[in-house]
Amino acid sequence: MNPNQKIMTIGSICMVIGMISLVLQIGNMISIWASHSIQKMNQHQTEPCNQSIITYENNTWVNQTYVNISNTNFLTEKVVASIALSGNSSLCPISGWAVYSKDNGIRIGSKGDVFVIREPFISCSHLECRTFFLTQGSLLNDKHSNGTVKDRSPYRTLMSCPVGEAPSPYNSRFESVAWSASACHDGTSWLTIGISGPDNGAVAVLKYNGIITDTIKSWRNSILRTQESECACVNGSCFTVMTDGPSNGQASYKIFKIEKGKVVKSVELNAPNYHYEECSCYPDAGEITCVCRDNWHGSNRPWVSFDQNLEYQIGYICSGVFGDNPRPNDGTGSCDPVLPNGAYGVKGFSFKYGDGVWIGRTKSTNSRSGFEMIWDPNGWTGTDSNFSLKQDIVAMTDWSGYSGSFVQHPEMSGLDCIRPCLWVEPIR
């Protein structure tokens, strides 16, 4: 075969290959066109379906050929029971306290991703209990954790996670931008209250089921703040206490009644010479009792109780077993502020049982260390320092911090009474 014949043979072979390639490309285009036509026809067809369908479509270019990938996932609907938490039962009688959970966040944070937090608290619906907390917008052992000691900064947010779990970015739910907060569940949805903004113009943002439903503007323009523990719900209405004014003098205090995330009523307390901060509130027999912090001049704790119409009573726990920190040694109490060592304070709580009271307090009189529960059978109204029960919760050698109350409703516990519970913040 001479060179010319070789060239002609090679050319013929190339031409045949090219024609075959062209036919294949035409067939590919026809196939894609037919596929799109079938998809478009199917999109106009409607069929009844009892399941939720989510279709994800990813469009990808490969070798200049349009490929359509369609994945269909079938999701069964999760029905969440809704029930009004009545709050009409009385507190369960108790003779002691048992440990419910501990998150060990500081220890886990030495290796894991754990938020820098303060002001944690617990609140329960009829289905679950969650830990709420104020982050500093940083993780433990991270460069952004330096200097996270401010109570109020634009980086602080209210978040929540299942109770007993260390608060991390992987299990936590954003609730609100906040440096002061509260949250509670009315049996239908979570209500969250997050306060943020400048000291002279802070705003409380109310969310119900994650949606902003109302706001409360600072009325004294002096660091509006709230409970740092759960609000209290009765018959579908939730109640909270807020403070606006000096932390070392007479301030203004208001009770708010909230329904489905909207303020329906508020009352300003007529409370001269009283100081209410960071109240711990709970329902009891259809009414609300709040035990608070006096940061001005009392080493015993002030209280306010009110009904669902916001008719209220005020006072101080009379017991000579003092509940604040710093505080003097136990002695003779008063139903007015006990002045020795009365300045400053720490968030705390108590549970009232008739004339008796369970008092939670630090074991130390001058530092936030240790924690104990004391039963004073006439301490709500009596001024002596006699008590009948004492139970250690945190050893004197360990740090404590804020503490507060929360409850489990009969709709959750199955009891015929409201179970009183407490939490303690281990500051490090």
Swiss-Prot record:
Domain of life: Viruses
Catalytic activity entry: Hydrolysis of alpha-(2->3)-, alpha-(2->6)-, alpha-(2->8)- glycosidic linkages of terminal sialic acid residues in oligosaccharides, glycoproteins, glycolipids, colominic acid and synthetic substrates
Membrane topology: Single-pass type II membrane protein
Membrane-spanning residues: 7-27
GO biological process: carbohydrate metabolic process
Compartments reported by the entry: Virion membrane; Host apical cell membrane
Top-level enzyme category: hydrolase
InterPro entries in the cross-refs: Glyco_hydro_34 (IPR001860), Sialidase_sf (IPR036278)
Protein name: Neuraminidase
Organism: Influenza A virus (strain A/Chicken/Hong Kong/YU562/2001 H5N1 genotype B)
Taxonomic placement: Viruses, Riboviria, Orthornavirae, Negarnaviricota, Polyploviricotina
Gene this protein is translated from: NA
